[in-house]
Amino acid sequence: MNNKIKLIKEDITQLEVDAIVNAANSSLLGGGGVDGAIHRAGGPEILEECYKIREKQGECKVGEAVITTAGRLNAKFIIHTVGPIWSGGNKNEDELLSNAYKNSLLLAKNHSLKTIAFPNISTGIYHFPKERAAKIAIQSVTKFLKQDNQIQTVFFVCFDFENLEIYNKLLQTYK
């Protein structure tokens, strides 16, 4: 199981994987952090597809996910998911964050993708506690991989050493 999960500290926009997960906001129109970086690096095609999705379904709800082209990125697709804003833990944030991971993995499966890279969803400007978010991420992905053999590799792409250390410590308990 654990050989399917890889932990790295890199620029997620540079990865050659089937899908990069974007920690998007509900507008799908780009923003700060990883969301802005993906839109800038991927180019206007990503935004164009996001506009089309909005025309069809409206905004993307928290915990849900949608898929677009990856534009100029080395990945084949971008899976945009909306993580919850941390509000103290009393507004279903844990379940919503878990859903963001599960729904992203389901989209990858439905598109026959084998490799997927996740950023640290909701731990930036959404202020989700990093250790709590990492635990939810690892549990959600591990549970999904136990039930599905199609996805071969899941990358957790940490944007700082603090997240890298947290994930590394937690992944030791899943060996």
Swiss-Prot record:
Pfam families from the UniProt entry: Macro
InterPro entries per UniProt: Macro_dom (IPR002589), Macro_dom-like (IPR043472)
PROSITE patterns in the record: MACRO
Gene3D superfamilies xrefs: Leucine Aminopeptidase, subunit E, domain 1
Macro domain boundaries: 1-175
TM annotation in the entry: none
Family: Belongs to the MacroD-type family.
UniProt name for this protein: Macro domain-containing protein LIC_13295
Top-level taxonomy: Bacteria, Pseudomonadati, Spirochaetota, Spirochaetia, Leptospirales
